[in-house]
Amino acid sequence: MLRVDRIDVSYGEVQILREVSFDIEDKEIVSLLGSNGAGKTTTVNSVSGILPVMTGSIFFMEENITNAAPYSRVALGLVQIPEGRRIFPSLTVMENLEMGSYLKGAKSVRKESLRFVMSLFPILETRKTQLAGTLSGGEQQMLAIGRGLMSKPMLLILDEPSLGLAPIVVSEIFEVVQRINKEGVTVLLVEQNISQALSISSRGFVLEEGCIALSGKGVELLGDPHIKTLYLGL
């Protein structure tokens, strides 16, 4: 479904990514892992078209999207939910969700998408007329995921969905990610919560200093001595 082939990305004169390559198959959950500053967000921002690629290529559904605009990638079914949620605080919950279905294809199935989102997050049904900025952090993350799902993604990119949330909410978010995947949506999960991310992922890729340092099946990476020592403190 997605193939990232040896991309280099820079901020000004500072090179952040060096020959980063990875792939995602249809209906997988794949984790992109690493410490702060490793290049995780830079990688997914390049995949979604927010950052330009200096060299290398990005393919989605066999189509070269390296130079495609972000909105074109969304129209193809590649949707990113950025770190920090970035909801519209002065709009209601329902208005935020409707903003996610602005493209023609998503708009035509808005009611169906809305039912699915409300089945995942029943709390949003009770909050639908409430201003999004008054929601709790966990509810805002649910809204951000829901808004992304309203775009009818084929590939959903989640950038640090558990960041700053209470443990009980984190568990709920990871359960929802699995439910979304079971409905046929492929997921790229960017996380610092490595143990939980790998436990639900078929495969994982570990970024260190802008390069892919490790890759493998989720269960294998959980048992890797390097992962245990550097990231899990074992």
Regions found by a protein language model. Give the residues of each.
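Helix-to-loop junction immediately C-terminal to a conserved catalytic motif
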Residues: 48
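Conserved ABC ATPase signature
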Residues: 131-135, 139
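ABC-type ATPase nucleotide-binding domains, specifically the catalytic core motifs of the NBD
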Residues: 12, 52, 93-112, 120-122, ...
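ABC ATPase C-loop
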Residues: 148-149
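ABC ATPase NBD coupling module
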Residues: 52, 64-84, 107-114, 126-129, ...
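Conserved structural motif at the start of ABC-family nucleotide-binding domains
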Residues: 2-4, 17
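The feature captures the beta-strand-to-loop junction immediately N-terminal to the Walker
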Residues: 33-35
